[in-house]
Amino acid sequence: MSGSSFGKLFKITTWGESHGRGLGVVIEGCPAGLPIKESEIQLELNRRKTGQSKVTTTRKEGDQIQIMSGVFNGKTTGTPISLLVENGDADSSKYELIKHLYRPGHADYTYDIKYGFRDYRGGGRSSARETVGRVAAGAIAKKLLAREKIKIIGFTRQVGKHIAEKIDYKEIENNIVRCPDAKMAEKMINAIMRARKTGDSLGGIVEVVAQGVPVGLGEPVFDRLDADLAKAVMSIPAVKGVEIGAGFKSATMPGSECNDEFVMKNKKAATATNNAGVILGGISNGMDIIIKLVVKPTSSINKAQNTVTQKGKKAEIRVEGRHDPCVAPRAVPIAEAMVALTLIDHFYRTKFSKL
């Protein structure tokens, strides 16, 4: 099975399954001399981990990070960094009961047909638990970006029909749905709890803003920055749509309104608006990157649904495991990580673009 690596100069390879002994990531291309502690990586993992609030899965994983290689005396050595998180609260008993059924919305059927064999425990490799490694690597990417004064901010923009209108970044970590609009956060929480009570789930929209991105990140044609960002966030389980800048709204705007006119700010060229989401010709123009991603409602729900067995017989399924009623709040740090990994990779690639 290929497809577990991401990046070119700053490259990560994640490994592990939802109910295996553990998960992790190997990072290549991190420069030597970066001060890093397990506690710094742990802060990011704590934002993503299970059982953190009433709107997340009840699975209780500590997600304690262990640095296995690539760091000595508190600094990176320039060699591959290996990070490990052990699984401690996996319960495969519920999956034993439905292992011959294809769960609607999951990768059971496609994995079965493609590989002829699959790990049915919690989805195995297709589970969002795989993103532990991404978030851990993203913590290091964020620290490297911070040295260049680039900051990544993610939040929940929408849950179901409830959309954040008032954006205050200080409010993001003050509520369990990571919404920058305090009043809307309560409505989101109530909506998620109603869905959970009925055995259903909700989707949402996560927004990520990258501040301080310099002019020049991205390559022409196939390695455009917006193309790589889209691939990065689309690789997150449950993500079904991506919008950069004005995105789909651009289809309703005339060119005279959509074009970002150039002006002078602080003696430098800048754009008066940011409908392009900072990227022109696949290359960043120095404004804030704004990217939104749509996450579908959690596929595992405690409602009866029609399906078929591996032998092609009609069946009914009800998924009774421990699952998030809405993945948007925990998808925030994952989306931040993927944006950070994309930007740091392009940052290093840009260093070699001219003498």
Where are these regions (language model features)?
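A short glycine/serine-rich beta->alpha loop
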Residues: 11-14, 119-130, 215-216, 274-279, ...
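Internal helix-turn-beta structural module
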Residues: 11, 290, 300-355
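Alpha-helical support elements that line or immediately flank enzyme active sites
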Residues: 21-33, 129-150, 223-231, 287-289, ...
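Glycine-rich, mobile lid/loop segments that gate access to catalytic sites or pores
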Residues: 113-221
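Short acidic, glycine/tyrosine-flanked loop/strand segments centered on an H-E-D-like triad
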Residues: 99-124, 305-323
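Glycine-rich anion/phosphate-binding loop at the beta-strand->alpha-helix junction
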Residues: 15-21, 199-202, 206-314
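N-terminal, positively charged regions that mediate nucleic acid binding
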Residues: 1-59
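Glycine-rich, N-terminal phosphate-binding loop and its surrounding beta-alpha-beta segment
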Residues: 44-104, 108
